[in-house]
Amino acid sequence: MSFPVGRVGFIHEESKGVLPLNSTNKCITRLPPATGVKDGLVWEESVDQAHLDLRFEVLREGLPRGSEHYPGIDEDARTRFLCAYEGGRLVGCSTLQTDEREGCRFRIRGMAVSPDFRNRGIGSRIVKRLQKHASEQGTGIWCNARIRAVPMYKRCGFVEVSDVFEIEGIGLHHDMEWK
């Protein structure tokens, strides 16, 4: 899997503050800012504690700490993480997993936007960037979308390919695809 190299930008690491991008940092691309996303979108090669904390806050309510980690996926060298930063703060994240099925090579997992930053287009911007990457690879994307996120995915061109189903302890979902 190849990811484009972008212009110089910044990434946030909890223990070191904001660092300039260089070959030793985890970030491999920086995209231009979008309205409402002051610092823009950043591809990262590994998941950090801020990413796990946001996943836990948004996606794992009522579940034990540690459930926000995806064993085997977060450590897979093919997995990438697209994060949205505003003012140096992680406000949105997603995991792009290589998980092939007919017409789709990638799967979106762990898509989360901080409650304080919802309804600003951050989630759509993340999804559209994931779609751009998949399109460049000549493939589609699939996901298990929570019911409340289905309208956003539809606005981004995804279609429902399943009836509603429940993921125990997490809630109701639709299987969705974009090709």
Predicted regions and their residues:
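Conserved catalytic-core motifs of GNAT/GCN5-like acyltransferases
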Residues: 142, 159-175
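Conserved GNAT acetyl-CoA-binding A-motif
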Residues: 127, 134-146
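Conserved beta-strand in the GNAT
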Residues: 83, 89-99, 105-112
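Short amphipathic alpha-helix that is part of the acyltransferase structural core
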Residues: 22-89
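Conserved acetyl-CoA pyrophosphate-binding loop and the N-cap/start of the following alpha-helix
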Residues: 117, 121-129
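Conserved active-site tyrosine of GNAT-family acetyltransferases
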Residues: 55, 153, 158
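Short acidic/glycine-enriched loop/turn segments that link adjacent beta-strands
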Residues: 76-78, 102, 167-172
